[in-house]
């Protein structure tokens, strides 16, 4: 069974996507065709979005599901004229919040993305630069400045998790790939041993890892299920030998991985 889901926003669409993905993941038997429509900031753009939604409804023979974070009341009114199930995320929560606080909201677009705090912006930019400079074991001399060092086999989610921790929480993150050569005697590389208290491991299901690696190098030893299984068994043995906390990321989104890493390591976020 297929249905179309739209994520509609006057900004980047990230909020609508995040909430929408969380909700739709509860309906595993339905295949959703997902469409993001960001920066809908005028009456004309809203009507164009409505036309696309109505077209999908006609083609699918079923109402699309629309997750909307439109703030402007006129745009929201136009949207509600389309043939779809509208989940108005601002409309659902803004009015009760106004009633409780006794204050009318500004209904201004992109308030959440304004750079209100120059210091927070600086922290975020510096954290992202650090994550990029210390990605994939390229440099290890600055590990003393890292808040956390993610380790794991190739293609296990280290880089995107590091970038998310930097962007969302302002943390200085590094990551280091463990290879077959590191598993001979289960010794940690010297660069990691010196910062063992900062290490956090990621692991993943062997079949899932094989599928991910096959997208890059199909048919190679690197992507074979046998190779992936061997690496992961040795990896988890290394984690256990050195008492390194780790997380199975197979069924988790990057957001979920990052939040759990933060909690399990007891790290304090620099950005609120």
Curated annotation (Swiss-Prot):
InterPro entries: Kinase-pyrophosphorylase (IPR005177), PSRP (IPR026530). ADP binds at residues 152-159. The keyword Electron transport does not apply. It is an enzyme of class 2 (transferase). It comes from the Bacteria. GO terms for molecular function: ADP binding; ATP binding; phosphotransferase activity, phosphate group as acceptor; protein serine/threonine kinase activity. It holds the Pfam family Kinase-PPPase. It catalyses: [pyruvate, water dikinase] + ADP = [pyruvate, water dikinase]-phosphate + AMP + H(+); [pyruvate, water dikinase]-phosphate + phosphate + H(+) = [pyruvate, water dikinase] + diphosphate. The keyword Translocase does not apply. Keywords: Kinase, Nucleotide-binding, Serine/threonine-protein kinase, Transferase. Its EC number is 2.7.11.33, 2.7.4.28. NCBIfam families: PRK05339.1. Bifunctional serine/threonine kinase and phosphorylase involved in the regulation of the phosphoenolpyruvate synthase (PEPS) by catalyzing its phosphorylation/dephosphorylation. Belongs to the pyruvate, phosphate/water dikinase regulatory protein family. PSRP subfamily. This is Putative phosphoenolpyruvate synthase regulatory protein.
